[in-house]
Amino acid sequence: MNEIRTQVQFIDIDEDMAGQRIDNFLRNQLKNIPKSVVYRILRKGEVRVNKKRVKAEYKLEAGDVVRVPPVTVEVKENEPAPPSTKLSKVAELEHCIVYEDDHLLILNKPSGTAVHGGSGLHFGAIEALRALRPQARFLELVHRIDRDTSGILLVAKKRSALRHLQAQFREKTVQKYYYALVMGHWDAECKVVNAPLLKNEVNSIVRVNPNGKPSETRFRILEKFAEATLVQASPVTGRTHQIRVHTQYMGHPIAWDDRYGDRRFDAYTAQFGIERLFLHAANIQFVHPASEKKLEIHAPLEAHLEQALTKMRQA
């Protein structure tokens, strides 16, 4: 058996920390401690705010002083190690950071990396970043992208930045552009796809359905190949698998899409070295939460995808 030990902490709550529930705050502070332990120390009154017991739903206020008790947890040797013990596997994410300042961090997420742990995954990009930056007081996802999609992922470093950026996403003022390699020749006249999407809650498959949620994606052709088209896709709404389903609906599924793709097209693109979902969040434009100035960030394609496109041009 191995042990994880933490020391007692006294934390002064500032404006950036204020507004969040104490249970969520503790789960962020005690990164490698099981959720059940967090709720146990709350229930037993070991966590104090201004020297008083609080319930899990208590919302922190600026000026609060939180006492986080020392915690010891036993971990079986055959259990997955916490992210902090897997730095050799996640350190490569440090090289994927394309922008960083005091308020936010932007990652060019590799394909195959989940944005967060869960569904059988013990850690994702956010857990890895927290392990790489143990001194960071606050790191939270602003939005999400699919595990197999690569590209831009925004992470807030302050709660005020998180609120500001998420408000922009809600108000649909954030502009996102994806690169997708789709089967066949995309019709240049097809610039907007408006098709409602409905998610099956049992198998998570999304389909175009008149009873679904309104969904809109804008498309632009970037380059045509013999049997494929590289398109730029800009989702106006943010539905699950939206670009993937809209391209399939139009008869042009994305290369190597294991849910909505075409195996014959996958075999065709494999000869050029493509063996992953060719969907990449390439560009984002938004208002910086502190400077209030418009910020545009570009995340380059992985080298092997660029090489694949070069081979397709020469074919």
Curated annotation (Swiss-Prot):
A single GO molecular function term of this UniProt record: pseudouridine synthase activity
EC number: 5.4.99.24
Name of the top EC class for this enzyme: isomerase
CDD domains: PseudoU_synth_RluA_like, S4
Highest taxon in the source lineage: Bacteria
GO biological process: one example: enzyme-directed rRNA pseudouridine synthesis
Any one Pfam family match given in the protein's UniProt record, by short name: PseudoU_synth_2
Ranges for domain S4 RNA-binding: 20-94
Active site: 146
Keywords: Isomerase, RNA-binding, rRNA processing
Catalytic activity: uridine(955/2504/2580) in 23S rRNA = pseudouridine(955/2504/2580) in 23S rRNA
Family, as annotated: Belongs to the pseudouridine synthase RluA family.
NCBIfam families to which the protein is assigned, alphabetical: PRK11025.1, rluA_subfam
Known role: Responsible for synthesis of pseudouridine from uracil at positions 955, 2504 and 2580 in 23S ribosomal RNA.
Record's protein name: Ribosomal large subunit pseudouridine synthase C
Organism whose genome encodes this protein: Vibrio cholerae serotype O1 (strain ATCC 39315 / El Tor Inaba N16961)
